[in-house]
Amino acid sequence: MYDRYKTFFCQNQRLRIPKDYLVMSQLILASTSPYRREFLKRLGLPFDSKDPQVDEIAQAGETASKLAGRLARDKADRIAKKTNTTHNVIIGADQAASIDGKLLRKPGNRHNALRQLMACQGKTVSFYTACCVIDLRSGSLLQNIDHTQVQFLTLHKEQLERYIDLEKPFNCAGGFKAEGLGISLFKSITSTDPTALLGLPLIWLASTLRAIGLDSLEPKTNPGVR
């Protein structure tokens, strides 16, 4: 499916990009998530966002890590196929979670959200945040999967119900919003990138975009830099 791309899993590999492409290239986020859009804005690079319309159902036997990686690639690839120019750089991202080796799906409703959070009490949950960058200028696909471990507090059922009613995290992996009140459910977080749990690993992404010529600290690519 991805044979037309040269695939890299090394964040520091610099690709040879013609200088004029830096001006013509357009950055596209393959997501309709308002949270991912806000996080990407932190890098200061102009971008557009488009709906990849990807089915996020897990395949039989698929682990959380493989699910997140596949969906991140599928989202970026779907937008890449729709574009009518070879100057675009496309970002796809996805997140999946597991507890005791079992995949935690997006709860979808209040009952499932409460059941998931009750199961997480006092335990360590693994979150896998995948990010994929497809550079149509060079035909390259770069990808990373960040592993974040979250140790949950042990709270009363009434507290969990109150949280769910306040934030309604029905479409979130694990049944909480780490960018909001969900942080109050945690005892500790272990990760190499604190932004990964929020849905977009900005440390890896900034480094990768810099490696392909889209540097947040360069005036040519970031209008906010003087």
What does each of the following model-derived ranges do?
Residues 25-28, 64-226:
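Anionic-ligand binding patches
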Residues 25-45:
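N-terminal beta1-alpha1 ligand-phosphate binding loop
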Residues 48-56:
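A short beta-strand-loop structural module common to alpha/beta enzyme folds
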